Amino acid sequence: MIIGIGNDTEAISRVGQIVARQTKFMDSILTPAEREQALERKGKHFHEFVAGRFSAKEAFSKATGYGIGEKVHWHDIEILNEPNGRPIMQVKNFRYKTYVAITHSGDFVNTVVIIERLTILERLSLKFFPKRGVL
């Protein structure tokens, strides 16, 4: 059952300007693994990546209704890419399933996050087969 949907849009150039001006912005927003993936990218792809992660974390905060900082912090949310490029969101101490979509068009990035309550079968699957995930 879907329990939350969040959406966010950011101007990639604006996030790029923030990264250039505020040296600690990336450290405060991105986890170490996300920073590593970001630094593998060059030019506009670097800014798209950082803006996408920032936007996705904002969308997550909207989907939960918590905001960032109250119950969830920037580093509690990690979005890494699978080998095929699909972003996967993991949230510390969060018992619900999350889905994230990140898309870029021109100077904008748009993200959507969906939060779903797991069925009992899915929860048992995660408990007994944690590396395998949901059946």
Curated annotation (Swiss-Prot):
Query: What keywords were assigned to this record?
Result: Cytoplasm, Fatty acid biosynthesis, Fatty acid metabolism, Lipid biosynthesis, Lipid metabolism, Magnesium, Metal-binding, Transferase
- Spell out the family assignment given in the record's similarity comment: Belongs to the P-Pant transferase superfamily. AcpS family.
Job description of the protein = Transfers the 4'-phosphopantetheine moiety from coenzyme A to a Ser of acyl-carrier-protein.
Instruction: Name the chain's protein.
Output: Holo-[acyl-carrier-protein] synthase
Coiled-coil stretches noted in the UniProt entry, renumbered to this chain: none
Q: Name one Pfam family in it.
A: ACPS
Which positions are annotated as binding Mg(2+)? D8, E58
Q: Which GO terms describe its molecular function?
A: holo-[acyl-carrier-protein] synthase activity; magnesium ion binding
Catalysed reaction, written as an equation = apo-[ACP] + CoA = holo-[ACP] + adenosine 3',5'-bisphosphate + H(+)
Q: Gene name?
A: acpS
Where does the record say this protein resides?
Cytoplasm
SUPFAM superfamilies xrefs: 4'-phosphopantetheinyl transferase
Q: What class of enzyme is it?
A: transferase
Output one GO BP term: fatty acid biosynthetic process
The EC number(s) given in the record are: 2.7.8.7
Q: Which InterPro entries match?
A: 4-PPantetheinyl_Trfase_dom (IPR008278), 4-PPantetheinyl_Trfase_dom_sf (IPR037143), ACPS (IPR002582), Ppantetheine-prot_Trfase_dom (IPR004568)
